[in-house]
Amino acid sequence: MTKRISAKHKIDRRLKINLWGRPKSPFNKRDYGPGQHGQGRKGKPSDYGIQLQAKQKLKGYYGNINERQFRNIYKKATMLKGDTGENLIGLLERRLDSVVYRARFSTTVFSARQLINHGHVRVNGKKVNIGSYVVKEEDIIEIRDKSKQLAIIDIALASKERETPEYINLDEKNKKVTFVRTPKFDEVPYPVIMEPNLVIEYYSR
């Protein structure tokens, strides 16, 4: 098991939830956190604890984004017009690693980030190797020609675990997608309950 997969499973156990809805999640086998104290007694969580859990779930889902980067995304969301929670989700879904994952070019957000880091992805014909790159509406994201035969991409596309959401237009044959529009929160196909309002409360303390 690679360090990346091990870390992903650890996130599931730490948050006590099958975060990505994967059938092989270790949380399907045990409902307690990692480590020798994972089976300890559970007290009633505080408001702070509930808000923190909501933040950790959202951070974890998008590839365990580090705290500094996630806080910066939140700050950007507060400066945009409209609902801050909707803005936060929109910014997260516009990350290039999120789009590659939603396009089903990868089975996880982590492997999407790897594809990008290794130069396999093009945005409007240009190489972009930063997973946090923010795409715009009508941007075309595609796998570069030399990488279109990669088995990991074909395996991901063949998987029936997920469907491509409506705000991404997939050309599966050419391994290309168009980012049609920024989605609303209720359009995002989360396999678990996400609560961006609690994340906003956490940072507003």
Swiss-Prot record:
Keyword check for Cell membrane? no
User: Which segments carry the region annotation Disordered?
Assistant: 21-47
Superkingdom, taxonomy of origin? Bacteria
What the entry lists under PROSITE patterns is as follows:
RIBOSOMAL_S4, S4
Q: Which SMART domains match?
A: Ribosomal_S4, S4
One GO location term (cellular component)? small ribosomal subunit
What are the S4 RNA-binding domain coordinates in residue numbering?
A: 94-154
Please name the Pfam families in this protein's record: Ribosomal_S4 (PF00163), S4 (PF01479)
Molecular function, one GO term: structural constituent of ribosome
What is this protein's function per UniProt? One of the primary rRNA binding proteins, it binds directly to 16S rRNA where it nucleates assembly of the body of the 30S subunit. With S5 and S12 plays an important role in translational accuracy.
Under the heading NCBIfam families, the entry gives: PRK05327.1, rpsD_bact
The record describes its quaternary structure and partners as: Part of the 30S ribosomal subunit. Contacts protein S5. The interaction surface between S4 and S5 is involved in control of translational fidelity.
Its protein name is: Small ribosomal subunit protein uS4
What is the organism field in this record? Pelagibacter ubique (strain HTCC1062)
Q: Which gene encodes it?
A: rpsD
